[in-house]
């Protein structure tokens, strides 16, 4: 390992231990009383479902994807694509659907996104997606409800 990489790993590791991992002004509110314990863990404790476990990975019908907690419309099916990551992925969100914050967990900097209506954590957004904006919204499938057209 190069010295610079080693120092970077040590620095981010110390930062993640010394600072709160998630600093947020995002207000979170459980609205759906029927959420499972696993959905609550992901949506309100910033968890992640296992890759490849969501049936939504294989959903190909036209429709829209909504927050499993508050039913806010988040994505249209035309923005869904197979990223090969094992999580439902989208290249464009409904305008105003999400609030973002920086996540320093696991010694790296990522952008986490939350439902703007209820604050539920949905996943991370990366700059390696297809299309003109280059975004890849990597979403936990348990956080979504698909509503066909």
Q: Whereabouts are the PLM-identified features?
A:
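Bacterial Sec-dependent signal peptides at the C-terminal "C-region" and cleavage site
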Residues: 14-29
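N-terminal secretory signal peptides and thylakoid transit peptides that target proteins
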Residues: 1-15
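A short Gly-Trp-Pro
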Residues: 26, 32-149
